[in-house]
C-alpha cells in the first residue's frame, strides 16, 4: 500500500518536472502580441492525467505552475501564470469528463472537446478578467495591450482563438503520439 502511494507521488513528480521543462521553452507566435506564448507542457499534463487520473493532472498543473514561477519568475504580475494554470484546467479537464471509449477516435473526440473548452474559456477569461486586470495592475491603457486591429473584439478573436487553437492542436497531437509509449511503463 505504501509502495503504491510512493510510486504514485513519484510519477506525479516526474510528470511535473517534464511539464515544467516544456513550460520553460514557451515561444510567441509572430503576428500576435508578445505576451501570448505557446508552451507544450499541457501535453505532458494530458499524458500524466490519462496515466494517473484527473487528480494527478490537477496536481501536475499546480506543481508545474509553482516551479515555473520559482525558476522563471513573472513579468505579468502573476496574471500570465494564473491564466496559464486556469487555461490548462480548461483544456485538460474536459478530456476526463468525456470518457469516450479508449480508441484513437475516442481520444481525438476527447482532445477536440478539450480544445473547444480551451478556446471558449480563453476568450471569456481574457476579455472579461485577465486583460482588464492586467491593464489596471500594469497601468497600461486597455486599448494598447492588443495592437492587431482597431476593433478590440476582432483582436481577441484573432489573437486568443488563434493562439489557443494552435496550442490545443499541438499539445493534443503530441499527447496522442506519446501516450501509447508512456502506457508501457505505467
Predicted regions and their residues:
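Loop-helix junctions at membrane interfaces
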Residues: 1-186
Amino acid at each position: 500500500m505504501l509502495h503504491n502511494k510512493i510510486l504514485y507521488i513519484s510519477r506525479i513528480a516526474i510528470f511535473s518536472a517534464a511539464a515544467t521543462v516544456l513550460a520553460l521553452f514557451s515561444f510567441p507566435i509572430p503576428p500576435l502580441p508578445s505576451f501570448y506564448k505557446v508552451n507544450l507542457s499541457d501535453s505532458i499534463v494530458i499524458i500524466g492525467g490519462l496515466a494517473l487520473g484527473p487528480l494527478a493532472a490537477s496536481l501536475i498543473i499546480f506543481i508545474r505552475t509553482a516551479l515555473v514561477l520559482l525558476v522563471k519568475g513573472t513579468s505579468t504580475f502573476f496574471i500570465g501564470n494564473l491564466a496559464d494554470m486556469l487555461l490548462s484546467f480548461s483544456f485538460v479537464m474536459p478530456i476526463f469528463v468525456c470518457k469516450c471509449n479508449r480508441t484513437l477516435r475516442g481520444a481525438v473526440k476527447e482532445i477536440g472537446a478539450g480544445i473547444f473548452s480551451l478556446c471558449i474559456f480563453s476568450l471569456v477569461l481574457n476579455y472579461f478578467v485577465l486583460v482588464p486586470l492586467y491593464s489596471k495592475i500594469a497601468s497600461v491603457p486597455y486599448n494598447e495591450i492588443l495592437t492587431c486591429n482597431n476593433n478590440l473584439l476582432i483582436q481577441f478573436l484573432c489573437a486568443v482563438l488563434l493562439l489557443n487553437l494552435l496550442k490545443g492542436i499541438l499539445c493534443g497531437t503530441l499527447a496522442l503520439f506519446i501516450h501509447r509509449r508512456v502506457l508501457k511503463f505505467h
